[in-house]
């Protein structure tokens, strides 16, 4: 997924900073996904997020350093109006539903409509069917979910925070897509104004950032 020509070489020494927001109903496992990804932790007890929590993750993808700011939002209906505060300027959105709960899947469709209305096609969307460890209790068909994701220009993923399945793939693929989107924007704007174009999406591109400065955050990965 690297950019063609000189774009890939130009981006090789850069650090990308991306904002990712998780959206979905309460009890679908958003917090469990983030904690499993960032800290490799899982709690069988339901974790209720009040308004939002914030975690960070550092990665190296094909020689490109990526700083992720991951916003985990509350799923309760009373917090829905706060959504725009958290997804504003996001580069990626992970829309989570519980495969055993048809209603949670239908609510994802509402989030997709809202995100497309507010942010257009510039945001990378991931639709995630979580709790695949409860396959026998599934109420959302795989074909229906994947077909819907394709129809709205999103990628679909199957995950289990409990069994640690599909989560690394989800975040890695999203990061690659966000890098590709940022590089396309850079090339479209030309060398002289690439930063301005990327800034519209909230992307921060730091040239030749020393590794020693890549500290901090709740979690990190090589």
Swiss-Prot record:
Localization of this protein: Endoplasmic reticulum membrane; Golgi apparatus, trans-Golgi network; Golgi apparatus membrane; Early endosome membrane
Catalytic activity, EC: 3.6.5.2
GO terms classed as biological process: anterograde axonal transport; positive regulation of dendrite morphogenesis; positive regulation of early endosome to late endosome transport; positive regulation of receptor-mediated endocytosis; protein stabilization; protein transport; Rab protein signal transduction; regulation of axon extension
Keywords: Acetylation, Cell projection, Cytoplasmic vesicle, Endoplasmic reticulum, Endosome, Golgi apparatus, GTP-binding, Hydrolase, Lipoprotein, Magnesium, Membrane, Metal-binding, Methylation, Nucleotide-binding, Prenylation, Protein transport, Transport
Topological category with respect to the lipid bilayer: Lipid-anchor
UniProt xrefs under SMART domains: RAB, RAN, RAS, RHO
Binding site for GTP: 26, 29-32, 43-44, 46, 48-49, 75, 130-131, 133, 161-162
A single Gene Ontology CC term: cytoplasmic side of plasma membrane
Subunit structure: Interacts with the cytoplasmic tail of integrins ITGA1, ITGA2, ITGA5, ITGA6, ITGA11 and ITGB1; this interaction is dependent upon its GDP/GTP cycle. Interacts with RABGEF1 (via VPS9 domain). Interacts with ANKRD27. Interacts with VAMP7. Interacts (in GTP-bound form) with VAMP8 in response to starvation; the interaction probably regulates VAMP8 endolysosomal trafficking. Interacts (active GTP-bound form) with TMED10; the interaction is indirect and regulates TMED10 abundance and localization at the Golgi.
Name listed for the protein in its UniProt record: Ras-related protein Rab-21
Organism: Mus musculus
Gene: Rab21
């Amino acid at each position: 997924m690297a950019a063609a020509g000189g774009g890939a070489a130009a981006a090789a020494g850069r650090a990308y900073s991306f904002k990712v927001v998780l959206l979905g109903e309460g009890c679908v496992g958003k917090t469990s996904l983030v904690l499993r990804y960032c800290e490799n932790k899982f709690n069988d007890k339901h974790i209720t997020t009040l308004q939002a929590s914030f975690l960070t993750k550092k990665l190296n993808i094909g020689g490109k350093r990526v700083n992720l700011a991951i916003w985990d939002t509350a799923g309760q209906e009373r917090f829905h109006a706060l959504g725009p505060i958290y997804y504003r300027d996001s580069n990626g959105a992970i829309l989570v539903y519980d495969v055993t709960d048809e209603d949670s899947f239908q609510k994802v469709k509402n989030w997709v409509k809202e995100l497309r209305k507010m942010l257009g096609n510039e945001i990378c969307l991931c639709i995630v069917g979580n709790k695949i460890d409860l396959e026998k209790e599934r109420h959302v068909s795989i074909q229906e979910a994947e077909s819907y994701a394709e129809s709205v220009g999103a990628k679909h993923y199957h995950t289990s925070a409990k069994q640690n399945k599909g989560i690394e793939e989800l975040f890695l693929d999203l990061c690659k897509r966000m890098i590709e989107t940022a590089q396309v924007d850079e090339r479209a704007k030309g060398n002289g104004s690439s930063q301005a174009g990327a800034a519209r999406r909230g992307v921060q591109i730091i040239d030749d950032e020393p590794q020693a400065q890549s500290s901090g955050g709740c979690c990190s990965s090589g």
